[in-house]
């Protein structure tokens, strides 16, 4: 049997766009969720007036909140319990470092103030909390759009420096170093990578001196950080803005990319002229995540098309289109965040199937313009990128397009999880725990996925 079962829906109050499970042993029950809320002047109470009686115009404000949840498998009704909330500038991206640093788990945030923040996980009375550790402003008047750690592959060399690559709304990439003794952020290099927003930056986990970037100019680029500013390749294979990239932590030469063009491409990094496979997913691909244990499974947050789980086995080995194993759309919402849990998930018992209401148990927010996240408009700009590439303006189809009505699901009522060092052979191939977050209904969803 194969299917996705809803365990819980949490109202995040502000619109949610980023969700990340902690990968570190002993902390894998912890889930971070970031939010992004655009507050326009008209949303505020009546403001002050100047002496002439005219209203003082205030700029738009991007608000954010960081939530930390603990997964408790002894509570079958509400397994996710909030343990901390922290108001911040709006959050565009988050990533946990894959290794402990100075004895602590570290969470990196990319925020709307143009900064990369480091937060340290510390034990509290009953659980854990995140406390500020370091912050670095990338540039003036920009939004920090993404970040990635250099530690994605198991078995990091002891002499390998700890690095972060980040991207911003001006099209720049920023290479940062993290001092592991007294964790602090230090900028190593910055360079112009794209003409417009650099939506995503990511390491090659097997060769962390190599990074990749995707921009709103529709370009996918590779860079050698030892020679900042000189690209290794430029691919125009995506036809709209490139907004998601992840190197496989399991297979050395495999890279996945996603775009507003609603396609996921798999690449062999030894030949970036042509992808191994091209899979349409009917929605802009904001985030993609390889499964922590099963090398062929890829999770994708596909905006108005919900989330999808792909089997990439044949795509990698036979250059065939990846198989979409699971596809779930959520009415009146945009799925921007998705992540696999590192917990081993076993011994599930389920109640009879039932149908969710259309809002999946949360209050549905009024629909707002797609510009709440820094998403471009729907039309194409025929600007030229200087390389003979007519620049398509990234956009999304109407939110209602392709959305399904209420679906029938099974509710999981009990589970057993294990947080420990994992031998891939021990991981139960049938069950996985995952989380997604959606924008307009400000909701965090917890799912159990059962595969073959």
UniProtKB/Swiss-Prot annotation:
Gene encoding the protein: DPH7
Pathway(s) of this molecule: Protein modification; peptidyl-diphthamide biosynthesis
Enzyme category, top tier: hydrolase
Top-level taxon of origin: Eukaryota
Sequence segments annotated as region (Disordered): 371-402
Record InterPro entries: Diphthine_MTase, WD40/YVTN_repeat-like_dom_sf, WD40_repeat_CS, WD40_repeat_dom_sf, WD40_rpt
Assembly description: Interacts with INCA1.
Role of this protein: Catalyzes the demethylation of diphthine methyl ester to form diphthine, an intermediate diphthamide biosynthesis, a post-translational modification of histidine which occurs in translation elongation factor 2 (EEF2) which can be ADP-ribosylated by diphtheria toxin and by Pseudomonas exotoxin A (Eta).
Residues found modified as Phosphoserine: 353
One BP annotation, GO: protein histidyl modification to diphthamide
Protein's UniProt keywords contain Phosphoprotein: yes
Basic and acidic residues bias: start-end ranges: 378-390
UniProt keyword terms in alphabetical order: Hydrolase, Phosphoprotein, Repeat, WD repeat
GO CC terms, sorted: cytoplasm
EC number: 3.1.1.97
PROSITE patterns referenced in this protein's UniProt entry, alphabetically: WD_REPEATS_1, WD_REPEATS_2, WD_REPEATS_REGION
Catalysed reaction, written as an equation: diphthine methyl ester-[translation elongation factor 2] + H2O = diphthine-[translation elongation factor 2] + methanol + H(+)
Renumbered ranges of WD repeats: 79-130, 131-185, 186-229, 230-273, 274-313, 314-403, 404-448
GO molecular function: diphthine methylesterase activity
SMART domains: WD40
Stated name of the protein: Diphthine methyltransferase
The family this protein is said to belong to: Belongs to the DPH7 family.
Pfam families recorded: WD40 (PF00400)
Lineage: Eukaryota, Metazoa, Chordata, Craniata, Vertebrata
Species whose genome carries this gene: Homo sapiens (Human)
């Amino acid at each position: 049997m194969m299917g996705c079962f809803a365990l819980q829906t949490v109202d995040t109050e502000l619109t949610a766009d980023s969700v990340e499970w902690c990968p570190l042993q002993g902390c894998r029950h912890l889930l971070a969720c970031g939010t992004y809320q655009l507050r326009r002047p008209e949303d505020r109470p009546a403001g002050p007036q100047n002496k002439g009686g005219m209203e003082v115009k205030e700029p738009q404000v991007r608000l954010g909140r960081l939530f930390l949840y603990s997964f408790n498998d002894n509570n079958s009704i509400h397994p996710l319990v909030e343990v901390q909330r922290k108001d911040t500038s709006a959050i565009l991206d988050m990533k946990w470092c894959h290794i402990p640093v100075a004895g602590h788990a570290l969470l990196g945030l990319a925020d709307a103030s143009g900064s990369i923040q480091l937060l340290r996980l510390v034990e509290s009375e009953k659980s854990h909390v995140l406390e500020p550790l370091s912050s670095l402003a990338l540039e003036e008047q920009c939004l920090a759009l993404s970040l990635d750690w250099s530690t994605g592959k198991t078995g990091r060399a002891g002499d390998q420096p700890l690095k972060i690559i980040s991207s911003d709304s001006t099209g720049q990439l920023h290479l940062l170093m993290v001092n592991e003794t007294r964790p602090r952020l230090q900028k190593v290099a910055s360079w112009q990578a794209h003409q417009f927003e650099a939506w995503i930056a990511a390491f090659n986990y097997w060769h962390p001196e190599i990074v990749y970037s995707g921009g709103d100019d529709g370009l996918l680029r590779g860079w050698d950080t030892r020679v900042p500013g000189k690209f290794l390749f430029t691919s125009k294979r995506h036809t709209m803005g490139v907004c998601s990239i992840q190197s496989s932590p399991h297979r050395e030469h495999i890279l996945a990319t996603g775009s507003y063009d609603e396609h996921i491409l798999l690449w062999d990094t030894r030949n970036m002229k042509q992808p191994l496979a091209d899979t349409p997913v009917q929605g802009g691909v904001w985030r993609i995540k390889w499964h922590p244990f099963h090398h062929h499974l890829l999770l994708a947050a596909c905006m108005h098309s919900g989330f999808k789980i792909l089997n990439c086995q044949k795509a990698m080995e036979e250059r065939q289109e990846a198989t979409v194993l699971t596809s779930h759309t959520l009415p009146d919402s945009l799925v921007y965040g998705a992540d696999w849990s590192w917990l081993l998930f076993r011994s599930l018992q389920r109640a009879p199937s039932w149908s969710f209401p259309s809002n999946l148990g949360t209050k549905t927010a009024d629909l707002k313009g797609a510009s709440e996240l820094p998403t471009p408009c729907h039309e194409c700009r025929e600007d030229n990128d200087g390389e003979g590439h007519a620049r398509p303006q990234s956009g999304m189809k109407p939110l209602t397009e392709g959305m399904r009505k209420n679906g029938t699901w099974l509710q999981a009522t009990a589970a057993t999880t294990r947080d420990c060092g994992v031998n891939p052979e021990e991981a139960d191939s049938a069950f996985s725990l995952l989380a997604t977050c959606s924008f307009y209904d400000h909701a965090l969803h917890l799912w159990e996925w059962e595969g073959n």
